[in-house]
Regions:
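Periodic glycine anchor positions in long extracellular repeat architectures
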Residues: 414, 475-476
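Alpha-helix capping/helix-boundary segments
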Residues: 82-83
Length: 688
């Protein structure tokens, strides 16, 4: 809910099971409450069921989908194609289906194939450049494309990472990734020479595209995704606010070109600052092409913002060369290295007392030395600022008010309660927001109600005009509407704009044709206001339920974009990359023409595999090598050789080692690196 309050147009959330974040589940009841809250602003709720599903879980998963539909979810993110083949048959045409990033979408051909299976939106691989995203958009201009813009990065293409399952029996495709890529490795050559010692060579920095949002918009991305796995509420507040404000700035800069997907402007009581939020250092990854500085080899942990360098150290304190303001309780850290070791470690401490730039830790850290860079990974003052109410989201409306001593000359059906000439009042309201399209409503609804304790009758009508309009009518006793003895304008405006306990705020009241000359009791104006709000709520809810003209299953089967055409060549050599974990998925791919529907890696190795285990699934075996590769475990666009400056193809220095290279864990398990220079890709494989 904090994400919606701080400007998100949509939120994605894991259900109790079957999400790609196993430890971040939410009950159906809680998701229903979130839907109710989000829909007030025209925002949407997307539920992740983006793991591969086993046969004995299949019916339970479908039952969960039905429950979630009943509580109002707007979209499902799916990975398992067997599940997709069933879900598309049971969800109503108001619920969207999104292809999770776990579907490994790198090309327009794959995106088109997914669209033909019934997906309405595709979440693209994080590794894509702006040019590659634009190529997909140009080929498929009607398909919604969603791009990651912020948060933790997986070093492997999502959906084709098996190293956690292989090493620890914990599958990334089942939402239980063991964070293999955050471990420290020795990098060794084929002769056993150590090139790097205990460095986090697969640990990437965090993504931040805050300065590239317009580029992404113009490339064809229609939705931006912020990763927030197990992050606290302060992270959500800060990051969502930063991106929402930047999007609004872009829309204001280019009126008419872009629009927001939900309603309401946010007033913030703090200034967002991404440097003060959990991060491992930031990178724009491959958005603008390959860069060397995308990984964080010294530590997989959050460094935070750079705040200066250690200047002078005393027994219980030290001085910092910095322009930052420090507070008691700040969390600081630094990178240290022993004189006799190549490895770097992160040391942290908390400030007990800050006197200007002189800091007194609770306990002086042993590795601190003059000249060292200092980082703040917990800003006490900023956290305190975020702990209270930090945002208010309101939908701006304009209200028109009119009154007449006459009833409507041509009453519509349902207006039989207004048959005399005692007079009418009316009001209509419109959402005012230049960042969105007007709300449209093409149906008409009439309703009469009468309060037996009052002499006034109310009538409300939703017109089929753009935007939302509401026309209640009022009848009075004793000769119709009475002229007021004193001006009524201020009271009319005051009563109609009392919207404090709603999601609305009135920016303007327009009183039509001198209607303020009549005396209207405040209680009647309050009831009129309530009716306006009630109808606006209905209009916004109806705005959510747009029918999706999804291709029928029969129609889908007519398209023969062969499965072999839409995935990298490794899929043909290694059919387990299709992640076939249930009978429905096997049947689906057989119908797609897949010649060998091999079981998923997790089915073949349910508890993982020990290094050196024999396998009938030999792949990428290289004759003459000392060690034969048996399994492709990760496909990475990140290249260690390039990042260390040894890519000759891109102008790096010539290596002094002999390939192949290996990553080695402290327990001596080894993983072979294969450099696919033609496709500019690094593969991580096990050895046997």
């Amino acid at each position: 809910m904090a994400a919606i309050e701080h400007g998100a147009d949509a939120v994605y959330i894991g259900a109790s099971r079957f999400g790609a974040r196993q430890s971040a589940g939410n009950s159906v009841e809680d998701i229903g409450k979130l839907c109710e809250y989000a829909h007030r602003y025209g925002a949407t709720v997307h539920v992740t069921i983006n793991t591969i599903i086993y046969n004995d879980e299949f019916e339970e998963t479908l039952a969960l989908v039905r429950e979630l539909v009943d509580v109002g979810v707007d979209a499902f993110l799916l990975q398992d194609m067997g599940l997709m083949s069933k879900v598309r048959e049971i969800v109503p045409d108001t619920v969207a289906l999104h292809a999770s990033t776990q579907c490994d979408t790198r090309t327009w051909e794959k995106a088109q194939w997914l669209s033909l299976q019934g997906f309405d939106r595709v979440v693209l691989a994080r590794e894509l450049s702006a040019e590659e995203i634009n190529d997909i958009h140009k080929h498929l201009p009607e398909l919604e494309l969603e791009a990651f813009v912020h948060g933790a990065l997986c070093v492997s293409y999502s959906g084709v990472c098996y190293v956690s399952q292989y090493s620890f029996g914990r599958s990334a495709n089942r939402g239980a990734c063991a964070q293999f890529c955050r471990l420290a490795f020795d990098l060794k050559d084929s002769d056993g020479k150590t090139i790097e010692h205990q460095r986090h060579l697969l640990s990437l920095k965090d993504m931040s595209q805050i300065d590239n949002l317009e580029t992404l918009m113009r490339s064809g991305a229609c939705a931006f995704k912020i990763e927030g796995r197990l992050k606290d509420i302060n992270y959500v507040k800060n990051v969502v606010s930063a991106y929402s404000k930047r999007i609004d700035e872009i829309i204001s800069k280019h009126p008419g070109e872009f629009r927001r997907a939900s309603l309401g402007r946010v007033r913030y009581s703090f200034t967002p600052d991404l440097k003060k939020t959990f991060n491992r250092g930031y990178t724009n990854y491959f958005l603008k092409g390959r860069q060397a500085d995308i990984f964080s080899p010294d530590t997989p942990k959050a460094l935070g913002e750079f705040v200066g360098r250690v200047k002078e150290i005393r027994r219980d304190s030290f001085n910092v060369s910095s322009t930052a303001n420090f507070a008691n309780g700040d969390g600081l850290c630094f990178l240290s290295r022993d004189d006799d070791s190549q490895s770097t470690r992160l040391e942290g401490f908390r400030v007990n007392r800050a006197v200007g730039n002189r800091l007194y830790p609770f306990k002086m850290p042993r590795g601190l030395k003059p000249g060292m860079g200092l980082y703040r990974n917990q800003d006490q003052a900023f956290d305190k600022e975020l702990s209270g109410k930090t945002a208010e989201r309101k939908i701006a409306i304009k209200i028109w008010f009119g009154a007449s001593p006459e009833t409507s000359p041509n009453p519509s059906k349902g207006e039989e309660c207004l048959t005399d000439s005692r007079g009418t009042i009316w009001a209509k309201a419109e959402v005012i927001d230049d960042r969105i399209n007007h709300i449209s409503h093409e149906s008409e609804s009439n309703e009469c109600s009468q309060d037996s304790s009052s002499t006034y009758n109310f009538h409300q009508r939703i017109s089929n005009e753009h935007p939302v309009r509401l026309s209640p009518s009022l009848g009075g006793a004793g000769g119709g509407l009475q002229l007021a003895q004193k001006p009524q304008r201020d009271n009319i405006i005051r009563q109609l704009t009392k919207l404090g306990n709603t999601v609305y705020e009135c920016s303007e009241v327009e009183i039509v044709d001198g209607a303020d000359k009549y005396f209207i009791p405040s209680s009647i104006l309050a009831e009129l206001r309530r009716m306006v709000v009630e109808e606006l709520d209905k209009q916004i809810l109806n705005m959510q339920r747009v029918t999706i003209h999804r291709k029928s299953v029969d129609k889908v089967s007519d398209h023969k974009l062969h499965i072999s055409m839409v995935n990298p060549s490794q899929y043909q050599q290694l059919p387990y990359l299709y992640n076939i974990s249930n009978d429905a998925a096997r049947k689906f791919y057989e119908q797609q023409g897949l010649p060998k529907a091999e079981p998923a890696f997790e089915i073949q190795y349910p508890t993982g595999a020990t290094n050196g285990s024999d396998s009938s699934n030999k792949a990428f075996s290289i004759k003459g090598d000392k060690e034969a590769v048996s399994h492709l475990l990760m496909q990475c666009r990140h290249c260690i050789r390039y990042s260390l400056g040894y890519c000759v193809k891109r102008g790096g220095q010539k290596p002094t080692w002999r390939e192949p290279l290996f990553l080695e864990l402290p327990d001596k398990r080894r993983f072979r690196l294969e450099f696919d220079c033609k496709n500019c890709q690094m593969n991580v494989c096990n050895v046997t």
